[in-house]
C-alpha cells in the first residue's frame, strides 16, 4: 500500500529528474513496463526506454520553473497530487497527477493534467 512518504519521495525524485534530464534519474521513476500519459486523453508512452526518450525530447532547462505540490489523496497503490508550476517566462500552470505505484515505489502508471492559470502568459 502506498503512503505519503512514498509519494513524497517519488515527487522529489521527479523534480530531480525534471531539473537534471539525466537518463538514470528519469529511469529510476518508472517500472520497466510503466506507462506515462502526458495528458489524460493521450496514448500512453509505454516502457521505461520510451518514457526516457519522450521525456528527453520534451526536456526543459533546470532553472525554468518553480514547483509546489501537495498530496490530495491515496487509495491503495494510487496517489493524487496537486501541483503548481511557475515558469520564469511568466507561464503559470495548475497540475493534477495520478500516479499508480509498484511495490518498490516506482510508478507503473503516471498521468498528468496541466491547465494554464488565468492571467498566465
Predicted regions and their residues:
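Short, charge- and proline-biased low-complexity linear segments
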Residues: 28-36, 53, 110
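Short, low-complexity N-terminal intrinsically disordered segments enriched in polar/charged residues
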Residues: 1-24, 28-32, 121
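A beta-strand edge to alpha-helix "cap/lid" segment located at domain peripheries
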Residues: 52-121
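Short beta-edge strand/loop motif at the mouth of beta-sheet-based domains
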Residues: 42-53
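Short, hydrophobic secondary-structure boundary micro-motifs
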Residues: 27, 38-39, 66-68
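A short gly/proline-enriched turn/hairpin at secondary-structure junctions
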Residues: 35-44, 113
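Short, charged low-complexity linear motifs
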Residues: 1-4, 15, 23-24, 37-41, ...
Amino acid at each position: 500500500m502506498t503512503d505519503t512518504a512514498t509519494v513524497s519521495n517519488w515527487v522529489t525524485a521527479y523534480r530531480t529528474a525534471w531539473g537534471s534530464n539525466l537518463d538514470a534519474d528519469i529511469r529510476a521513476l518508472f517500472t520497466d513496463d510503466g506507462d506515462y500519459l502526458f495528458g489524460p486523453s493521450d496514448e500512453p508512452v509505454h516502457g521505461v526506454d520510451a518514457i526516457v526518450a519522450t521525456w528527453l525530447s520534451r526536456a526543459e532547462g533546470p532553472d525554468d520553473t518553480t514547483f509546489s505540490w501537495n498530496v490530495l489523496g491515496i487509495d491503495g497503490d494510487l496517489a493524487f497530487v496537486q501541483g503548481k508550476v511557475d515558469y520564469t517566462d511568466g507561464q503559470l500552470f495548475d497540475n493534477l497527477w495520478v500516479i499508480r505505484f509498484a511495490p518498490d515505489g516506482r510508478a507503473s502508471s503516471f498521468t498528468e493534467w496541466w491547465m494554464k492559470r488565468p492571467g498566465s502568459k
